[in-house]
Amino acid sequence: MGGFTKEAKKGYIEVAFNGSLASILLDTQFSVPAKGVTAIFGPPGCGKTTLARCIAGVQRLPNGFCAIDGEIWQDETTFRPPHLRRVAYVFQLPILSSHLSVRRTLLYNASNSEPTLIDFDGVVELLGLAPLLERTPSHLSKTERQRLALGSALLGQPRLLLLDDPLIVRDRSAKCEILPFLERILQSLALPMIYISHDITDIERLADHLVMMKDGTVTAAGPLNVTQSDPALASRSEAAICLDTMVGGYDGRYGLVKLRLKSARFLIPAVPLRPGARLRLRIAAGDVSIACEPPRASSILNVFRARITASLPHGDAEVTLVLTLETGHSGVPLLARITRRSFDALRLSIGAEVFAEELCGKLGDDGMR
């Protein structure tokens, strides 16, 4: 993480912690925009939760720095306690008062802060809590309890929403139930979120920025699609790149949505979508093939000029190529997984200009961002 400087920058989340807590040795530094979702990803036990607790001020490392949107929470001379950081920290298993109804729980949390971000009625509407207001936690499902915990956290009028693996115990159907509410929070409130998870599928759906951890160390940090091309993720069997595109139109004759990304254009089979809507496209490495010349006649609709920036072995028979699409002033990353035989037969090398043929990217569960 060379080049990191400990300064509070407006519009950024600045974090640097070094030291040991509860047998976890942290060596973490990253800087990400203080907007959207920053996911912290890594295997269980790598220090994600310890890092989250340091950011929230629940645990303290003497050698630490934390600043949010230009406001210093911890440095050599400052340590702001948790109640002064205005962090909404939602745990894996929500802690709720068993004797209070949903209504009374929300009103209790609303009474402690002026509604600068959202008020009681706004939370009830945003999280669909109206039918649950007279119930107690024992009469709520796990996802309903999670929604109540989110609502209570938001009524604290936080500067930062910190979610520590909130979907870790959920099956896929339960995750699909709660994820849209997280997306509604993101779309409705100007509130940065740090999302702790070891499930890359959830991260691909939610995150704008990604911080990767291993053995207590931050190994990479940056925009999601850039960090997805890091060897640690690009080498995974399910490697993919997520691209945030804009709907540019619809081909009604063939049922194809037209998507724009800088100067690139994608055609994707889908129902009509509102022009101008933002849409996340997931392109798996295995869905991209490589050609050295532009195809003259092909069933592949999406073909782009690209340059090979890295090649990573994948088992004995395959190679993962890290590509940069030529889409204007700055390139867009893409991954392609091909056989070693094809790599050698095409005489590919780092820096080679090629044509990336994308079979058909997939939209997220709901597609919209």
From Swiss-Prot:
Domain (ABC transporter): residue spans on this chain: 10-240
UniProt KW Transport keyword: yes
Pfam families cross-referenced by the UniProt entry: ABC_tran, TOBE
Predominant subcellular localization, coarse grouping: membrane
One CC-aspect GO term: plasma membrane
This protein's UniProt keywords: ATP-binding, Cell inner membrane, Cell membrane, Membrane, Molybdenum, Nucleotide-binding, Translocase, Transport
Record membrane topology: Peripheral membrane protein
Cellular localisation: Cell inner membrane
Oligomer and partners: The complex is composed of two ATP-binding proteins (ModC), two transmembrane proteins (ModB) and a solute-binding protein (ModA).
Name the UniProt record assigns to this protein: Molybdenum import ATP-binding protein ModC 1
Lineage: Bacteria, Pseudomonadati, Pseudomonadota, Alphaproteobacteria, Hyphomicrobiales
